[in-house]
Structure formats: C-alpha cells, structure tokens
Amino acid sequence: MNGSTQKIPIFVLIGNEKVKSYIIDLCKRNNLRSFTGADLEELVKKIKKRSGAVIVMDYEVVNAYGARIYSRINVACPGCNLLLLCDQDQRDLIKEAVEHDVYACILPPYEEWEVLTMIRNIVAKEKLQDQKKLYKKKEL
C-alpha cells in the first residue's frame, strides 16, 4: 500500500471474532492503521468530527443495532465510507445498506484483494475530493 493509503484510518466493528481477527491481520500485513471498537458508542466517539475514514463492519453488528447504525455513523462522520461484510442470502440487509449509502458490500470469503481494492478505491476518491477542494481554493 502506498503512503496516502496509510493516512486513512480503518475502523473495525465486527461481531464475528474470526472475521474480525482476519480483517485486523489483513490491515497489519498491509501497513494500514486499524482501530477496533467494542461497540457502536465507542466507534462513534472515535470517528466523531473526522473528515474521513473507512469503517468495516459485518452483518452481525447491523443485526444487533438495526438500520439506525447507518445514521449514527453518518451523523458522527459524514465523510466516512462503510464496507459491509455480509452473505449473499442477506438480500434485505444488502438492499438496506445500499439505501443508506454504504460504499460496498463484500461477500464471503472476503478475499484479501477484494477488501484492499475497496480500501484503495475509497482512498483514491478521498484524494480526488481533496484535490478538487484545493483547486477551488486557488480559483478564489
């Protein structure tokens, strides 16, 4: 991963311990700064007033908190991008996630290349937005 990717924090809120360990290990192996949250309240405190971050969560967390999880996260960090780890048979959950502007839903087996590609795409999008802001400031 490049230097700009390392600046974007990855927040992990995953109920399945095996999947959580896998994602945290994936972040470590790729020099990504990852932070885990014990629950939604802790996550909201960590992301509050951030301009951007990646949040990786699984369907267990969404099932535990319901659809309000999306609004809580969006209010705390409007610039955060969510990646949802879910199963293909959870179409209702996927539909709900899309309706709440989740960046992507990733299906098992949560391949390393797929997770990293999503993170890279988010970082590229953030970088482009930052460049546009800089350009607008120069125009003024």
Task: Show the residue positions of the predicted features.
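CheY-like receiver
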Residues: N2, Q6, A124-L140
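Two-component/phosphorelay signaling modules centered on CheY-like receiver
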Residues: I14-A38
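Conserved phosphotransfer microenvironments
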Residues: K20, A53-V75, Q90
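Acidic, metal-coordinating helix/loop segments flanking the phosphotransfer/catalytic sites
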Residues: A38-V54, V62
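Alpha4 helix (beta4-alpha4-beta5 surface) of REC/receiver domains from two-component response regulators
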Residues: R68, Q88-A104
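C-terminal output helix
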Residues: D92, Y110-I119
